[in-house]
């Protein structure tokens, strides 16, 4: 499960974006399912976004539209943990298509 922490931001050059982090905060040491956002440098490998809310993304990274039947598995006991899944599902998950804007833009890291 994640929360939005208003004092946490993603920074890129002069740009600054509010972002969602794990409930346990940011730490160097982490293990799967601990609700910690790992500290480090990572490469963005894929982008998911709400096409109805974000009109255009200009990047060389693969971009995918978030659809109503998309979820993200957050069940550490599942083989699908931390992966995109199709809803409905038996696994614990986060719905990606939501009324709020927490998942309007998702950056998948390596």
Which positions does each model-derived feature cover?
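Cell wall/extracellular polymer interaction/catalysis modules
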Residues: 1-110
